[in-house]
Amino acid sequence: MNFEFSSDQMLLKDQARKFLESEESVKKAREVLEGEQTHDESLWKSVIEMGWTATTIPEEFDGLGLGYLELCVIAEELGRSLAPTPFSSSVYLATEALISLGSNEQKQNYLPKLATGEIIGTLAHTESTSSPSIENLSCELNSNKLN
């Protein structure tokens, strides 16, 4: 079994690293942490333009249709550089939940928008079949444990 990245994956990794170094993402992360922003908008737009938000989205939904190893090399470089973007919520959480569990209608509606960065995704979960509301919560936090 070969655990090495392919030459294409190494090229992607090198390009991602060089790009993120040129963007001074560590400096941008500090600015986001010390400011009111949720992420660095200009860096996020660049990530979208590079096609990284479309990495694992199937081509039929306007994605690149690449695999998890390609996603891994991009994610590793984003993490290494502390890139302050909503990549994790949009790509790992929302995109993967839709690919794995979404109806065809949900996939057609949301995956192309996630691929192009038109929307930022995240994952939400509710406890019951009732509408999400603080009054409907039965889960409590006691001694740092959910009960």
Label each residue range with its predicted role:
Residues 1-88, 109, 113:
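Amphipathic, small/basic residue-rich leader segments at the start of a protein or domain
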Residues 4, 56, 93, 124, ...:
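Conserved beta-strand segments that form the floor/walls of ligand-binding pockets within enzyme
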Residues 15, 23, 77-78, 91, ...:
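Fold-independent oxyanion-binding glycine-rich loops
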Residues 19-23, 97, 121-122:
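Short alpha-helical functional segments enriched in proximate histidine and acidic residues
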Residues 37, 50, 92, 117-119, ...:
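Short, basic and Ser/Thr-rich N-terminal targeting/leader segments
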Residues 63-64, 105-147:
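Glycine-rich, Trp-frequent "lid" loop and neighboring beta-strands that shape
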Residues 83-105:
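N-terminal glycine-rich flavin-associated loop
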